[in-house]
From Swiss-Prot:
CDD domains per the UniProt record, alphabetical: trimeric_dUTPase
Disulfide bond residue pairs: none
Molecular-function GO term, any one: dUTP diphosphatase activity
Name of the protein in its database record: Deoxyuridine 5'-triphosphate nucleotidohydrolase
UniProt record similarity statement: Belongs to the dUTPase family.
Record field: catalytic activity: dUTP + H2O = dUMP + diphosphate + H(+)
InterPro entries reported in the protein's UniProt record: dUTPase, dUTPase-like, dUTPase-like_sf, dUTPase_trimeric
Summary of the function given for this chain in its UniProt record: This enzyme is involved in nucleotide metabolism: it produces dUMP, the immediate precursor of thymidine nucleotides and it decreases the intracellular concentration of dUTP so that uracil cannot be incorporated into DNA.
Native organism taxonomy: Bacteria, Pseudomonadati, Pseudomonadota, Alphaproteobacteria, Hyphomicrobiales
Gene3D superfamilies in the record: 2.70.40.10
Amino acid sequence: MTIHHDTPPTLNLIRLANGEGLDLPAYESKGAAGMDLRAAVDGDAPLTLAPGERALLPTGFIFEIPEGFEGQVRPRSGLAFKHGITCLNSPGTVDSDYRGEVKVLLANLGEEAFVIERGMRIAQMVIAPVTQARVTEIAAASETARGAGGFGSTGV
C-alpha cells in the first residue's frame, strides 16, 4: 500500500535544451515508487552500448530535490532482466543541493549490443527522506552476539 502524504514534497524541474520534447519524469502506475527517467540523447544519433560498455546518459533536466530528501537513481527491472542493462553506482544519489543535469550511468552486462534512443525510459528515480547522523569517535566497539563476523557469517 502506498502511503499518501497530505502534502507530498514538491520536485521542481528545469528543462534543459537537450530535454526539449521529452516527457516529464513520471510515475507509470498508481503505486510506483520511482518515476521513470528518459534518455536525452540526440534523436539523430541513438547510442549503441556494446556488451561490457558503460555510458553516462543525460536526462535533459535539472532536479531541485527538496531539502531533507534525496533522489535515488535505480535500474529499471525490465531492462535489467531482458537486456542486462543496469545502473552502475546503484542506487546513485542525487543530493538536495546538487544543481547540475541529472545523468544516468548505464552499463551493458548482456551479451548483445543495446541501442538507446531518445526518450527511452532508462532508469527510475525514487525520492526518499534523508537522515544525517551525528558522527562521534569512540575508543572501542560495543559487544554484540555477532561481533565482527560479516560476509556470510550469519548464513547463506
